[in-house]
């Protein structure tokens, strides 16, 4: 019995290496989990411009769900982070206005969409509170598997109306913006 107890005591002895491993292991696991979450589940961004005022302010830090469109398609009015079609090294944040197969036209600042069923609707603009939209643009026929984007601050937004490559492919959408976490926490609608 004494030999068994001595062996058990020796196994439980702390060594400097074991202390370091015991200390570092939870930190390493936490870092790996954080990286996996950032890479596979969430995307975050700092908004550098006023193109989405007043929905998203300059300097706001936002979080998007990378999983939002795995089983569902993006919907009109979703605010998304996506790869800018004219330079995919940059991420942009805009609102989805036109869906695949639709035609988008802006007349006197009002956005009209001709849906795939041929019905033309005037889009709601209750989120466009920062300015009075002006101008005529389009018509733009949205290709299959692509989307037409506009900023909420319509008079100060570099969006689908002005890009060389007017549309964002679904696979280039990084995620659906779900909330702002700085400087205040609030849901993005």
Language model features with spans:
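Hydrophobic membrane-insertion alpha-helices, especially the h-region
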Residues: 24-40
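A short acidic/basic microdomain associated with nuclease active sites
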Residues: 49
């Amino acid at each position: 019995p004494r030999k068994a107890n001595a062996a058990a005591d020796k196994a439980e002895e702390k060594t400097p290496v074991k202390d370091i491993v015991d200390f570092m292991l939870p930190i390493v696991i936490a870092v790996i989990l954080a990286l996996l979450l950032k890479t596979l589940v969430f995307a975050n961004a700092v908004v550098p411009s006023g193109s989405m005022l007043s929905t998203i302010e300059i300097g706001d830090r936002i979080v998007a769900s990378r999983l939002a469109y795995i089983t569902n398609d993006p919907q009109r009015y979703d605010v998304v982070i996506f790869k800018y079609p004219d330079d995919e090294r940059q991420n942009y944040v805009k609102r989805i206005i036109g869906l695949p197969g639709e035609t988008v036209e802006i007349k006197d600042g009002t956005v009209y969409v001709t849906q795939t069923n041929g019905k033309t609707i005037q889009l709601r603009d209750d989120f466009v509170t920062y300015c009075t939209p002006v101008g005529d643009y389009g018509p733009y026929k949205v290709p299959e598997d692509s989307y037409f984007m506009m900023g909420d601050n319509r008079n100060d937004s570099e969006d689908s109306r002005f890009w060389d490559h007017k549309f964002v492919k679904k696979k280039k959408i990084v995620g659906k913006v779900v909330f702002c976490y700085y400087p205040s926490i609030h849901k993005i609608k």
